[in-house]
Amino acid sequence: MGALRIDSHQHFWRYRAADYPWIGAGMGVLARDYLPDALHPLMHAQALGASIAVQARAGRDETAFLLELACDEARIAAVVGWEDLRAPQLAERVAEWRGTKLRGFRHQLQDEADVRAFVDDADFARGVAWLQANDYVYDVLVFERQLPDVQAFCARHDAHWLVLDHAGKPALAEFDRDDTALARWRAALRELAALPHVVCKLSGLVTEADWRRGLRASDLRHIEQCLDAALDAFGPQRLMFGSDWPVCLLAASYDEVASLVERWAESRLSAAERSALWGGTAARCYALPEPADARL
């Protein structure tokens, strides 16, 4: 029986415009409910047997919602939720979810006006230190231009895994008109990859291209360049596949996203390295239990 293949990054929501202000003009495909019954046939078609559900908005009710879904659905292997890490009663708040599939936390750092000041805040730093001391993962969500702002933060918090979402969001939409964009992102990525406790999700790249005009052949080449750069920086044992469904639907179908990474991996990685990319690294970092049966 083969190892369980895992989609390390996807979202669920019951859509209300007030809850998801980031779903704006031109994003109508996202302005509807997305729940497990819609995802799991797509996963099955790609031989993916489990997923990690990641928060898509701030609020403790978001965490509770995802954990409720995970309780009823075996294929949701883990939840990356949201919590106010600056709260003085953080330990008590997180204790409410003990015994669940909660494995980590995330905040949309990319939306903060001053990312460096946010992560340098003493209360936030105390919260992240507590998470790591208690074996919770922290997912880091920033744009390429913000990577230098989290370098020192990531270096300081080295007691447990940090996961860089979407490969640090390279500015793919700029690659054709800015010869420095790829090199700038790659240099910042290598700085983070030098920290052995930082791992990287190969996720969310299709929507960093100019998805409003549709993906072009040049976009696919640039995405492959980014995949190569991430492999060069992190090595094959610190990469994990994530679909970023349903956000990926702005640019490509679930099958297209998974197939793009599959083709790339087949041409670059050994069988053991592909096993790490497609589940082994996610299982290790998020401390997922060994499945009794990896059947879909």
From Swiss-Prot:
EC number: 3.1.1.120
Gene Ontology MF term list: hydrolase activity
Keywords of this entry: Carbohydrate metabolism, Fucose metabolism, Hydrolase
An annotated GO BP: fucose catabolic process
Pathway: Carbohydrate degradation; L-fucose degradation
Pfam families, sorted: Amidohydro_2
Cofactor, how bound (note): Does not require a divalent metal for activity. The purified enzyme contains Zn(2+), but the addition of chelators does not diminish the catalytic activity of the enzyme, indicating that it does not require a divalent cation for substrate turnover.
Source superkingdom: Bacteria
Catalytic activity: L-fucono-1,5-lactone + H2O = L-fuconate + H(+); L-fucono-1,4-lactone + H2O = L-fuconate + H(+); D-arabinono-1,4-lactone + H2O = D-arabinonate + H(+); L-xylono-1,4-lactone + H2O = L-xylonate + H(+)
InterPro entries per record: Amidohydro-rel, Metal_Hydrolase, Metallo-dep_Lactonases
Role of this protein: L-fucono-1,5-lactonase involved in an L-fucose degradation pathway. Catalyzes the hydrolysis of L-fucono-1,5-lactone to L-fuconate. L-fucono-1,5-lactone is the best substrate, but the enzyme can also hydrolyze L-fucono-1,4-lactone, L-galactono-1,4-lactone D-arabinono-1,4-lactone and L-xylono-1,4-lactone.
Additional observations: It was not possible to determine the kinetic constants for the hydrolysis of L-fucono-1,5-lactone because of chemical instability, and thus, a stable mimic (4-deoxy-L-fucono-1,5-lactone) was utilized.
Assembly with partners or alone: Monomer.
Family named by the database record: Belongs to the metallo-dependent hydrolases superfamily.
Name assigned to this protein: L-fucono-1,5-lactonase
Organism from which the protein derives: Burkholderia multivorans (strain ATCC 17616 / 249)
